[in-house]
């Protein structure tokens, strides 16, 4: 029964039903949170073995090369840990840096270094340009957009599809506008849509002519191994493809263990051409003599090898896949027949992207808040928090317990239905 096909009387009856459902929802006095994609306590417990590593034996603090990880130095990170993640990311180990906890910090630093000093191929520092723009596939990751926005860089939204961003649009924009210096990308299980970039899209992104010679792909491979199935996405060597296309310096690849081990005490990674690695370390070396190598050694011993990481991710999958399945089940049961919403069914990552009736996302989120269900601000997945259709809501089901996920999604569905009937009645 599509709500849009209902006459006014039937629609009014539905509206009254949803008002009653909403009153019952408020009476429950819930206090639930779907706002951020955080690992649950049970997921964090999977990595408690790190807390007893690297151990206290005579040489427990030395890596396989004999390096004393307690001391200064080693700006590129431990080679053995880099080798594990080079395999997982499909990159040469010599083109990978292992850093401290936050890959977001490496992204931030890369933008700051470009603003202050210019990147390789830059005619001048970005801060000396009258205008700097960044392309933002949307819906996308709000913290990416926040970095560029905070420095006065103009965020330009571009559509994203199931196989990645709309390259037809991107190619036209970058070919003629030298102020466009880069694009934010989440190539595997994109936040929040779950899209995985096709090889064709990746090839076009590294090959396309750009008016800015220093154009950068900010390649945040945050969910490279974060599958919700028993299969992993085959890594694509974006650095190799870019080099073959004559644009070796275009990609800056980022990743971390934040949603693999401890979100607040992991290891970050930056992959790039040899020249870009030297550029980054030259500037990063002014603020640090080296990363936390003891923590890197912990992770090396905890994982052992790339298969150890894959086994860890399957343990994560066992905990969170039922939550994603429950979200899909409830949304279909509550919203499917009414045809007032659509949503993604991701194969990996941390989010479900819900599109409610156009013009009602803010109202839906406000209703949810008043019923004790915290949801990410409507529009947050778009540059400047401006969703042109006011329809997108990001759902983060990993942190709450399974019963809380059930209550939160069921309640959110009630709010979406009520908001839709309000909007449709206003049109009739």
Curated annotation (Swiss-Prot):
- Recite the UniProt keywords alphabetically: Aminotransferase, Isopeptide bond, Pyridoxal phosphate, Transferase, Ubl conjugation
Q: Where does the chain bind substrate?
A: 37
Q: Which cofactor does it need?
A: pyridoxal 5'-phosphate
Q: Which SUPFAM superfamilies match?
A: PLP-dependent transferases (SSF53383)
Which residues of the sequence carry a binding annotation for pyridoxal 5'-phosphate? 72, 102-105, 191, 222-225, 256-258
Determine if Ribonucleoprotein is one of this entry's keywords. no
Q: Which GO terms describe its molecular function?
A: L-aspartate:2-oxoglutarate aminotransferase activity
Please tell me which positions the record assigns to the cross-link Isoglutamyl lysine isopeptide (Lys-Gln) (interchain with Q-Cter in protein Pup).
339
Q: Name one Pfam family in it.
A: Asp_aminotransf
Q: Which family does it belong to?
A: Belongs to the class-I pyridoxal-phosphate-dependent aminotransferase family.
Q: State what protein this is by name.
A: Putative aminotransferase MSMEG_6286/MSMEI_6121
Organism listed in the record: Mycolicibacterium smegmatis (strain ATCC 700084 / mc(2)155)
What does the record give as the organism's lineage?
A: Bacteria, Bacillati, Actinomycetota, Actinomycetes, Mycobacteriales
